[in-house]
Amino acid sequence: MRIDIITVLPELLEGPFAHSILKRAKDKGLAEVHVHQLREFGAGKHQQVDDYQYGGGAGMVMQCEPLVNCIEALQKERNYDAVLYMTPDGTRFNQQDANALSLLGDMII
């Protein structure tokens, strides 16, 4: 199983992957985890990935272009069984979801 994770803060994931159940899976050769910096696909001199807020409220609005460009670049390298896009208003991840994902080969999160 290969898991490619796209994020603007890859350094935040170093700790959990070095000391968790994912580390044991990596050590046993059951999973590969690759973290990709979304800003590498951002626009302009500052590799911007966020957009202007609209409608008020707190939070960050992401541009779709950098994410699409990153996913397309990854898909050129290999075929993925799933592309998972997490949102704050999505469904809650549970054990049933984990069991279903464990049957897949490669995925992008």
In which residue ranges do the predicted regions lie?
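Post-transcriptional modification and biogenesis factors for structured RNAs
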Residues: 1-109
